[in-house]
Amino acid sequence: MTDQPQQLTIRRPDDWHIHLRDGEMLEAVAPFTSEICGRAIVMPNLVPPVTSVAAARAYRERIVAAVPAAHDFTPLMTCYLTDGLDPDEIEAGFAEGVFTAAKLYPAHATTNSAHGVTSIASIAKVLERMQKIGMPLLIHGEVTDAHIDIFDREARFIETVLHPLRQQFPELKVVCEHITTQEAAAYVLEGNQYLAATITPQHLMFNRNHMLVGGIRPHLYCLPILKRNIHQQALRDAVASGHRRFFLGTDTAPHTRDRKETSCGCAGVFNAPSMLSAYATVFEEIGALAHFEAFCSENGPGFYGLPLNEDKVRLIRQPWTVPESIRVGGNGDNLVPFLAGETLNWQVVL
C-alpha cells in the first residue's frame, strides 16, 4: 500500500463558472475566489442582466475593485443571451477582449433567468456568428417545461435541445455547465473537441439523499438539483478517467442565510471558501489525484485556448474546519458556506 501524500502542489487553478453577484455581496465573496484562482468565468445573471459590452466592462471594473490588491486575478466576462441580442454586439465584445464567452439560460431555468432564451431559433444568428469567430457557448442545460420532472430536465435538454443545436452548429464550442447526470457525462465523453463540461464539488460529493434524508438541507439545494447516487457515481467516474474535456467549475452561488433557510428558499451553493479542499477530497477518495491538477488548472485553459497560469498553489494534509458563516455587509446578513462546520483534511496554504 502506498503512503498517503502529505501535500499537493498544483498550477494555480481557474474557476470556469462563478456567480459573484454585485454590491456588498460581491465585496464579501470575491476574495474567496481571487485568492485561490487566477481567472474565473463570471456569470452574467445580474438584475438587469449583462447583455452589452458596456455593461460587461462596467461589471468587470466593479469586480476588480472588490478584489484585494495582493491578489493576481482576472475576471473573464460573459454575455447573457436574449432573444433579441445583436450578433454584432457579441462579436465586438469578443474582439475587444471584454466577452470571453456567452451564456445560454433557458428562460426561467435558474436564478435571474427570466430574460433567458425562449428558443434556439431566436438566437440562431448569434450562434452562427459565435461559431464563426470561435466564441464558446456556455449552457445551463435544463428544459423548463412545467410538465417535465425536475430530476429529468437535464437529460431531456440533451435530447431535445443540445443535440439538435450541435448538429446545426457542429463547430460551435459548447460547455455543458455543472453537469449532474450520467446522460450528460456520457454525452461529453462521446463528443468531439468542440464539447466540454464543468462539474461542481457538491455534485461530486453528494447526491439527493444527502439533501433530503433525515431532514431538508437547504444549503445543498442548487440547480440543476442533486440527482440519484448513480448519477453522482457517473460524474466521479468521468473525472477519475482523466478525460481532458471535464474541468473545474464551482457554480458558487451565494445567497444570504435568510434567503436559503425559508419556506421557499433560493437555489445556490456558496462553495468558494472550501471548493479546492472539497475537490481534493473527492479526487483522493476515487484514487484520481494524478488527474487533480489537470482538472483544476489545465483542461479549462486548453478548451478555451488560453495560457496556463504560471504560479502554484499548495494544499497540505492538515485538518481544518469550514466556517459556520461569513458576514456580508454591515446589516447582520451572513452566508453559510458549503460544508459549513465540517472538517476537511486538505487545507490550502497561501
Swiss-Prot record:
Substrate binds at H19, L20, R21, N45, H140, L223, H255, A267. InterPro entries: Amidohydro-rel, DHOdimr, Dihydroorotase_CS, Metal_Hydrolase. Its EC number is 3.5.2.3. The keyword Aminoacyl-tRNA synthetase does not apply. Keywords: Hydrolase, Metal-binding, Pyrimidine biosynthesis, Zinc. This is Dihydroorotase. GO terms for cellular component: cytosol. Pathway: Pyrimidine metabolism; UMP biosynthesis via de novo pathway; (S)-dihydroorotate from bicarbonate: step 3/3. It catalyses: (S)-dihydroorotate + H2O = N-carbamoyl-L-aspartate + H(+). Zn(2+) 1 binds at H17, H19, K103, D251. PANTHER family: DIHYDROOROTASE. Homodimer. Catalyzes the reversible cyclization of carbamoyl aspartate to dihydroorotate.
